[in-house]
From Swiss-Prot:
Protein name: Regulatory ATPase RavA
Pfam families from the UniProt entry: AAA_lid_8 (PF17868), ATPase_RavA_C (PF12592), bpMoxR (PF20030), LARA_dom (PF20265)
Assembly and interaction partners: Homohexamer. Interacts with ViaA.
Single GO cellular component term: cytoplasm
SMART domains: AAA
Function description: Component of the RavA-ViaA chaperone complex, which may act on the membrane to optimize the function of some of the respiratory chains. RavA functions as an ATPase.
Length: 499
């Protein structure tokens, strides 16, 4: 297969040429080009006057030798207007029912049918066969048709009970278009005087018939790796579990896979990647509500599973659990402990400081920071005599928060393990320890786990970088993946830097 960087660069330049003079239609042009290069159909949904027909006309110039046919359907349209008139000569002389197809759909490579759902059953049934089999029955013969791209357009969706489901299912790519939104683009649109009949494509970029035929064979050899299949299957399972999800036929999944193969091929790759799978957002929806649903499910898929983001976070959680267990064990050893001295009249134990405490002023570190008096507190400064008096007699005790300012009232307690602790206003407690006892490096077993996570994350980022660029996927979707990987990196870093 000739999957090279040169091919990817050529297709990118071809797309940019086709996009010239069309504003806020970059994604639409690129997907229509992908459909044309892989022999698929596109449905454009949107109000009148938003360049739907111009997009279809522009795609003709992607090929060196391509005929185009376009037609605006009405409820009065006849098959003769789409597939060609009957040959009176053949009917009169030979009694044959034959159409004159020159200049009509059966001899066109690029086809644009506007207001598609207004066509009658005779047109739609013939069109269905043409899309399915790329064949057209003309009298007693059945001819192969050269159609590479069918662009169907409408300002409405097909009626649910109108018998149009089979044809709608053949429209693999579905795009929802709107008017130009950005001020600068709207200005450029108004002052642009170029004709939609002008060819913006340099001859060297246009596709020959031989190249097109060869590429159809090459696309079939693009691999679906196990990770790609698992992602697609996971998406299918997610959608099957949702009541509001659209029905997606096996045929549509199969055709969508070939589109992903084509995306990989024309981006210079020999296998489908998670980035290509983003294209399913334009293949699986049925109406506005399911468009939103599909996009949401795909976003979850690519930001949680495409590059092992959720798996990495789960393993990080496991490492953090090990770390917390280790720190709890260390807390038992490091905590500032007091000694039982006995009880007063059998009612209550009293405590005293260990004899090893010699300093007159104690700096005690909170093993977990708390908010005290509207300040995040990491350590306390308490006078030894004040603490000893509190242990003996109870009452009020005061200390400096983080060792600065005036002394503040403290809510100290001795827990059931004889550890000195402090509580905040919500009664959340944190055990206190002496600074010199608290500095304790993590064991190699845990630090190695963090390093392993960092290595796995770097590998996933390398793969993500390797899978780019992808001409047919909007940059904002790639940014979602990058943001999710960055979030994983930040969580790992935060865990490593925790005291």
């Amino acid at each position: 297969m000739r999957q090279t960087a040169a091919l990817a660069e050529r297709i990118s330049r071809l797309s940019h040429a086709l996009e010239h003079g069309l504003y806020e239609r970059q994604h639409t042009i690129r997907l229509c080009l992908l459909a044309a290069l892989s022999g698929e159909s596109v449905f454009l949904l949107g109000p009148p006057g938003i360049a739907k027909s111009m997009i279809a006309r522009r795609l003709k110039f992607a090929f060196r030798h391509a005929n185009a046919f376009e037609y605006l359907m009405t409820r009065f349209s006849t098959p003769e207007e789409v597939f060609g008139p009957l040959s009176i000569q053949a009917l009169k002389d030979e009694g044959r029912y034959q159409r004159l197809t020159a200049g009509y759909l059966p001899e066109a490579e690029i086809v644009f049918l506007d207001e598609i759902w207004k066509a009658g059953p005779a047109i739609l049934n013939t069109l269905l066969t043409a899309i399915n089999e790329r064949r057209f029955r003309n009298g007693n013969s059945e001819d192969t048709i050269p159609m590479r791209l069918l662009v169907a357009a409408s300002n409405e969706l097909p009626e649910a009970d109108g018998g149009l489901e089979a044809l709608y299912d053949r429209m693999l790519i579905r795009l929802w278009l709107d008017r130009v939104q950005e001020k600068q683009n709207f200005h450029a649109l108004l002052v642009n005087n170029s004709s939609d009949r002008d060819n913006p494509v340099p001859p060297a970029l246009s596709v020959s018939d031989e190249e097109y035929q060869q590429w159809q064979k090459d696309i079939e050899h693009v691999a679906l790796p196990e990770v790609g299949f698992e992602l697609i299957y996971m998406l299918r399972q997610q959608l099957d579990a949702l009541e509001q999800a659209p029905y997606i036929s096996d045929r549509r999944w199969k055709k969508a896979l070939r589109l992903l193969q084509a995306s990989a091929f024309f981006c210079g790759r020999d296998a489908i990647t998670p980035v290509d799978i983003i294209l399913l957002k334009d293949c699986l929806w049925h109406d506005q509500s399911t468009l939103t649903l599909i996009e949401r499910q795909l976003e979850l898929l690519i930001t949680e599973h495409a590059y092992q983001q959720k798996s990495l976070l789960f393993r990080l959680q496991q490492v953090n659990t090990k770390r917390q267990q280790y720190q709890r064990e260390q807390s038992e050893l490091q905590a500032f402990s007091v000694e039982k001295q006995g009880h007063f009249l059998g009612r209550k134990f009293h405590y005293t400081l260990p004899d090893t405490i010699a300093a007159e002023t104690l700096d005690l570190v909170l093993q977990r920071p708390l908010i005290l008096h509207d300040i995040e507190v990491n350590h306390l400064t308490i006078e030894k005599n004040a603490l000893q008096g509190w242990l003996q007699k109870g009452g009020e005790i005061r200390g400096k928060l983080n060792g600065i300012g005036f002394t503040q009232r403290l809510d100290l307690l001795v827990d059931d393990r004889q550890h000195l602790a402090i509580r905040d206003i919500s009664l959340q407690s944190s055990v206190l320890s002496l600074p010199e006892k608290r500095d304790c490096a993590l064991p190699a077993e845990i630090t190695d786990e963090y390093e392993k996570l960092n290595m796995q994350l770097r590998e996933q980022r390398r793969l993500f970088s390797q899978h780019q660029p992808c001409l047919f996927v909007p940059s904002e979707w790639l940014a979602k993946i990058e943001a999710s990987l960055q979030q994983v990196a930040e969580q790992i870093q935060q865990s490593e830097q925790q005291d």
